């Protein structure tokens, strides 16, 4: 009897797939569009740490679906590549003195080795790397299309600059401290510095970016996050005349009905009117206040938890309707980049205004109430209601009626207009860094922009030794004079020395996969029409806003220019849940690294002081040393075991804790299949009850794969394998279809079983997904409840009259039960035939 030698089997089939290019995409144009599917993973950034077990979760899900579709005769596009430009590689290069290109390419080789070890069905001939010159040539080309369409422009804007590091920092690299902002790296002082930056006019697409979310099958949470990020508000822009001046201040509000309760205006410290209206005697103190506030991040200034600060300018504005004089303040919580950079403050009906008014003893006038009568305000009334304390024609009306009348009055008197506002800002698209795509623009002596011609692309990143920051806030490229200075028609021009952000390459990579070796265009139009849109896109929820929003923006521009055929790039989106790990906490709530923890008598203790620790679920991190390396898992249990375990842990979209005990159960499951393979293979007709169970299994697994419920599909397979083990013979008419439906989950074992049955080529080239026959199904299943201490943790379907021992095994192999009894003492197990298993534990 042979042993399940997973190492030998997995190596054998990985070599076979590579040699025969088993997963090379079919380019036959005669394959109809309805029989094609584009399945895509969010491609990884190749960090020096390599993969941990969380990465393959999404990759395994797409791989199962890919193999299932191949077995159903589909033409499947399932590529992989690397998001290889970006800040982490450059920072690591600066720290180590190694070139970012060498670091990146070494990391990619490690990633590929790990990915291939898991047996994923990628067409590696389509691999892309965003730092590859043949790729970023087309990133530059797309930038030029944006530029020609008027969607790319330069502007001087304030950025974080660190004099000690000699470089500009991203918001994420700056820490706010009581002593002011500091760099995350080195804890150096940072300052706001105006620098010329490239921006992309994503704001031009704000409305479409909201509207077209209705056309995609995405999680509601992601749609809501994008809508909130774009931040659409419908309201009125109102003009307030400044007393003793012809100047006006424009404010935007969604509640024009509250204009009667305005008791002051607040301007952003950076508002252009501040210097014009401030009284001379107040200018020194206001200048000092401005300098302090603009050093803060937008998040810090607008945080509800932060104290609101402000200062009076000495100037007054006139309420356009009531003609009341109202003081003009500047306040930290108003941003110059949102709306008009000024607000009309109605403290009776806005939380921030209420807090500010209380702090500075400003009037609070109620003009809306729930009942239509004056009330004592302990907190602002922010709901709709009945107007009070307003001119007669506006008084005692519902909010919606007052809004309508106020808007009409403002428009008729040319003091306001209806307007839609968005929180979304234009995308800052330049970085003062080396490791990114060079921007294909030249400047003359007058800083006029000259875009490169298409035949001048790619503008290659010079291979330099000194890629450290320039020390002036400029990119390291600014130091390469023979690269920066370009002679044209006898004149000297200067290249743009900023580079593109990491997001650039990931904005369009899904298109390049369609035609990765095309040297004439970014992708062939026929191939775009054939494959797009991406049918299923799987990746982490952390990309819900930036990557997905930027990719949608670029896609819409390409759609408007006629280069792509769909309004949206990704038809269906799934966010896989996070795979977490155990961590350990002391009595003060401090997390202790795993290598400082020891287990004694099912309890956990600190190695340093022998104090007992609490086991909790936490995100995998280097500092906690609770990262699980897939290489170790594959070495001990095999890739097929790891793949199945990650899918069996729970629903794809749920967060789940890693537990090696569950993995051992999966390994045993695969060994059971091998035991069946070792039985006498026969062409005899199987008993009716086995045929019935087979068709039930095919039906359930088919339905579960289609709906991405992989955990229940695996559970169904386990139940059927346990049933087959009871029989002395291995029936070919059963083993053949069961090997096929197993193969998407355990492709190496599936191939081995296929070959064992006498087949010569890959199961994914030669097999067809079995069809179930409803007439063959005998309904003898029962739903049972799995409980811990009397509380239901799961419900599963089992065969009627399942014996007590099998029930117990099913319960103890159930992932939800494992999670709830982990490190607990089992007191007793209660089973009720065909109804429940209750595990009593403490």
From Swiss-Prot:
Name of a matching Pfam family: tRNA-synt_1_2
Gene3D superfamilies associated with the record: HUPs, Isoleucyl-tRNA Synthetase, Domain 1
Cellular component GO terms, alphabetical: cytosol
Annotated binding of ATP, by residue: 622
Chain span(s) of sequence motif 'HIGH' region: 44-55
Subcellular compartments: Cytoplasm
Superkingdom of origin organism: Bacteria
Disulfide bond annotation, renumbered to this chain: none
Catalytic activity: tRNA(Leu) + L-leucine + ATP = L-leucyl-tRNA(Leu) + AMP + diphosphate
Short sequence motif 'KMSKS' region: positions: 619-623
UniProt keyword annotation of rRNA-binding present: no
EC number: 6.1.1.4
One GO BP annotation of this record: leucyl-tRNA aminoacylation
Family: Belongs to the class-I aminoacyl-tRNA synthetase family.
NCBIfam families xref list: leuS_bact
Protein name: Leucine--tRNA ligase
Organism, as annotated: Borrelia duttonii (strain Ly)
